[in-house]
């Protein structure tokens, strides 16, 4: 077992405005143009038919189109990954992987999965947060034949206990995973015990391509992080993370959080500053923090953002599971009119929890309806 020794923590002020009528920075998504029907303001999203359903999906959660141009779907309730081609045909299922909640693929065609793992301590079986890899290249992309290898997991002392509704009581859980250009990857971790100054439950771990944590960088990040905060650097109740396909943004990442005690800063793009003789290294928001001109993406617009992704132009897409909405932003955090909610999509989404993008098409894991939906801009229709 490798111990968790690298952390990216976050903290800041919270502005709780729910229940207030004056929300100067709030963007009302209900006023945006419809996503289906007539074309409004030049562009809107049109659903591609048919929806992918009836092909074995059961509460699909996270989805990812990998560098092999194949869609991967996590099914936590069925303890498996489903492999689907871009025509909607199921190509296979993984071997058993316990409660997979997030997935990505590196450039070596390794699937990297945030999941759980059962281990035995003193004759008692306990469950811990884990990272699994499926090395597709070594098995000719036959996902059914490729073994599920646990490459990293939490200590048994941090084992998971949940209540009857599945909510975490004690222990740590991994909630997201995102790969970098050099095949390193980040893991988002959440938990309720955050009193430790060096190893709180709320962290973002950084592992190299061979699944080793980065202890050397650990010291650099500590001064600017606060895993219990409520500001733009906080990482309470992390739900997802994404990185960028190019080296232009280096180690940058975007996180989503579902903390109900937080109205602002639920989706933040972080970039690393090396510091100077007068300032310590730190993670900072790439978006403007000017309170008089706060970008839409940092405003009081989200309830439970579940997943985030970026396209080739660095447009940012966020799925909100409570609002049943897709929100699209430009790289400066401005909400774009292609965004849509229930009234604009004909109630197409129900508790969506995953999103991915390929070749101008947006794929959404419509969890409540047990299906995958695809959307294309009206201007891109052939």
Which stretches of residues belong to each language-model region?
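Short loop/turn segments that connect beta-strands within beta-propeller blades
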Residues: 84-89, 135-141, 208-212, 271-276, ...
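Beta-rich, blade/repeat-based domains predominating
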Residues: 55-66, 97-106, 160-180, 226-249, ...
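Conserved beta-propeller blade signature
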Residues: 70-72, 110-113, 184-188, 249-255, ...
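Blade-level signature of beta-propeller repeat domains, shared across WD40, Kelch, NHL, RCC1
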Residues: 349-382
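C-terminal motif of bacterial Sec signal peptides marking the signal peptidase cleavage site
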Residues: 16-19
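A short helix->beta-strand "capping" segment at the edge of beta-propeller domains
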Residues: 27-60, 291-292
């Amino acid at each position: 077992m490798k111990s968790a020794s690298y952390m990216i923590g976050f903290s800041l002020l919270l502005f709780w405005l729910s229940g207030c009528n004056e929300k100067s920075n709030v963007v009302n998504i209900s006023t945006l143009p419809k996503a289906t029907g007539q074309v409004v303001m030049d562009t809107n999203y049109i659903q591609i038919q048919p929806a992918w359903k009836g092909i074995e999906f059961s509460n699909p959660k996270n989805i990812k189109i990998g560098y092999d141009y194949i869609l991967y779907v996590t099914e936590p309730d069925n303890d498996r990954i489903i492999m689907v081609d871009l025509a909607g045909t199921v190509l296979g299922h993984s071997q058993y992987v316990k409660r997979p909640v997030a997935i990505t693929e590196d450039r070596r065609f390794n699937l990297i999965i945030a999941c759980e793992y059962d281990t035995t301590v003193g004759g008692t079986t306990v469950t811990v947060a884990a990272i699994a890899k499926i090395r597709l290249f070594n098995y000719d992309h036959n996902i059914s034949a490729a073994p599920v290898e646990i490459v990293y997991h939490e200590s048994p002392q941090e084992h998971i206990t949940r209540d009857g509704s599945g909510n975490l009581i004690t222990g740590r859980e991994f909630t997201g995973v995102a790969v970098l250009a050099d095949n390193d990857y980040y893991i988002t971790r959440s938990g309720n015990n955050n009193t430790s100054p060096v190893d709180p439950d709320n962290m973002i771990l950084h592992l190299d391509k061979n699944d080793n944590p980065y202890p050397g960088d650990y010291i650099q990040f500590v001064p600017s992080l606060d895993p219990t905060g409520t500001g733009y650097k906080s990482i309470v109740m992390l739900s997802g993370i994404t990185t960028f396909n190019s080296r232009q943004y280096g180690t940058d990442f975007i996180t989503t959080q579902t903390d109900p005690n937080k109205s602002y800063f639920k989706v933040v793009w972080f970039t690393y500053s090396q510091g100077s003789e007068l300032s310590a290294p730190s993670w900072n928001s790439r978006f403007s923090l000017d309170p008089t001109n706060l970008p839409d993406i940092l405003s009081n617009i989200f309830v439970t953002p579940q997943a985030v992704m970026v396209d080739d132009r660095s447009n940012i897409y966020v799925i909100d599971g409570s609002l049943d909405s897709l929100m699209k932003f430009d790289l400066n955090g401005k909400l774009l009119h292609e965004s849509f909610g229930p009234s604009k999509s004909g109630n197409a989404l129900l508790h969506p929890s995953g999103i991915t993008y390929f070749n101008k098409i947006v794929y959404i894991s419509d969890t409540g309806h047990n299906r995958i939906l695809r959307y294309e801009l009206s201007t891109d229709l052939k």
